Amino acid sequence: MKIEVSTEIKNACPQFAGIAIAAKVKNTPYCEALWQKIDEFTVRYREMYTTDSIKDIVTIRATREAYKKCGKDPSRYRPSGEALCRRILRGIPLYQIDTLVDLINLVSIRFGYSIGGFDADKFEGDTLTLGIGKADEPYEGIGRGMLNIEGMPVYRDAIGGVGTPTSDNERTKLGLDTTRLFTIINGYSGKEGLREAADYMVELIKEFASAEDVELIEFE
């Protein structure tokens, strides 16, 4: 799978960089060892941050700024990385979905990135292009119904949108039958920190999802 960044994104967010991770995986409904790791990190996170101070985390702040430059209100349509962090800081447990989604969420809260997670077999075509959502562009967010993505960064495959920082699309979402994972770490703050987050993602998918044939794709 190739990833291209449109001119409109490069103009709005010139520092943007990303890393995609592709791998063969085995998903499971729940992993106790992973959730022990998540719970331990959540305790530490609540000691380090408040709902006010997370605005100063570089990755979260940069994603919010990217929304504003593209034409979206990040307080009304929160990027997922920020939304997950706010959730745990309000004392609400993270959603327990399945092992792949849960470990992606752990990487997201640890580093502050909004991360897309996809079933690669559900993509149409061989290229994803990162652009900006248009008025009335159809997009069904996972568990959200039709989502207004106008002015929002969006990855599109051959037939339409598959992922935004706020929500991925129902059409390409991960499931228990997923065997080919494709995940994208979105660095609106630039390259710094991306590789560390990607390496942690690889560590988790190898430990908890039996990942094989892991490939990292850097793009900007």
Residue locations for each model-derived region?
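Charge-biased, low-complexity intrinsically disordered regions
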Residues: 1-220
